[in-house]
């Protein structure tokens, strides 16, 4: 295993300007890159609040994300590095689109209606304070990218940090 001293790719902290609230938007297996970011002390040091949205067709597809977030509560290494209760900064917002669950609907639809913001106790994303990372299927990424830009957020890169970034690797 070769470990690099610094993370690379599009979903990295260096591609975002400083902010107060970090949003992770995922569909299906798009949750995976956020697993490492949720274990990264910098995530909790840089943001007052971390909101994770995970939209899947079926309830079972949400299990990985839910288990990971629950496991953070007992992560002794993060607690030692960041401090006890670091996980209280996290708000997890799982939704399904086909199978019945406590929260039904695509996150983009729930944002458009204002329901997601009401549920989470926030307003729409604000470019002065909110930062976002997007990882999902291509159609979702494009739709959410358009939505974030309608809120005034701009896409960033490692060489030009802004308010949001999108995963660019896709499998055929």
Predicted regions and their residues:
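FAD-binding FR-type
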Residues: 1-23, 165-172
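Ser/Thr-glycine-rich phosphate-binding loops at phosphate-binding pockets of nucleotides
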Residues: 27-32
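Histidine-anchored nucleotide/phosphate-binding helix
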Residues: 33-45
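Reductase modules of NAD(P)H-dependent flavoproteins
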Residues: 53, 60-172
